[in-house]
Amino acid sequence: MLPIKPIQPYPALLLQKKSERVLVVADLHLGWEALLIQKGVHIPSQTPRILDKLLRLIKKCKPTRLLFLGDIKDAIAKVEMEEWRDIPNFFETINKKVPDIQIVLGNHDGTLEPLLPETVKILPTTGAVFGNFGLFHGHAWPAPELLGCRNLITSHIHPMVAFRDPMGFRMTRQVWIKATCDGKRLAKSVLKHSSGKVAANPSTLLRDQFNVEPKVSRLFIMPAFNEFLGGRPINERRRGKNAKSRAFIGPVLRSGSVNIDNAETYLLDGTFLGTVSQLRKFG
C-alpha cells in the first residue's frame, strides 16, 4: 500500500494534517489543443472536461487547499489565444469552491501569472513542504529544505507503462510510481547545484547551512491530470550509450539517487502492476 492517499481512480492525491486537507493535481496543460491546431488537427477545447473532473474531485474530497504541482498551461514561451480564453475562467470557477489555491510552477508556466486571479498563490519551482512531504514539479532541482522530508512527490514526466500484445499492438496506461531514494546521494547533488560545492559529508553541510536533517527515503511520481496527454512509458527498453539516463527527464531522476529499476507501479485504480524492471519485458 502507498503511504500517500491517491484518490481512486483519479490521477490526484489527498494529503492530510490535522484539519488541513490538501488536494494535489499536476500537469493539466490547459490549451494543449492549440498545438494540434497548428498542425492541422482541429479538436474542441478539452478544458471544460478537465474542469468538470476537478470539480467532481473537489466535491468528493472537500479540500481546504488545492495545490497544483506544475504545468497548468501548455505553451512554454508565450500565451496562446486558447489559454487567454480558458485559464482565467477555469481558476475563477474553482476558486469559488476552494479559496486557498497554490501553484508550484512547472516548466510550462513561465507566462502563467497574468492569467490567474490575485487570490492564487504562486510557489517557486523549487517546491514546497507539507508535513513530511516535499512537493516539486520535477524539471528543476528541489530546494534543500525539501530534503528534510521523508517523502518527495513530483510529476513532470507523465508516467505510463506500455504493453505490447503478441501481434505487436501497443497500448499505454497511466501509472503512479513509488521508488526508493538515496537521500544522501540526492543531498550531495542538490547541494552541488545550489552552492556549487561538492560536499564530502552532505548531511553536515545541510545541517550547517539550511538547518535540515536529510531524511528522504522515497519518491513518488504523479500521473498527469490531463488524461489526453501522451506520456513517458517507464518500462520501454532503450539502447545505446547513456540509455538509462536518457530514459528520464528532470535532474533528480538523472542524479542516480532514485532506484527506478525496482520502483513499484500502480494503476489509477490502485492495482499493483509490478516493478519497472519486471514490466520491461512487456514494453
Regions found by a protein language model. Give the residues of each.
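Extended recognition/assembly regions associated with phosphoester-bond processing machinery
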Residues: 1-283
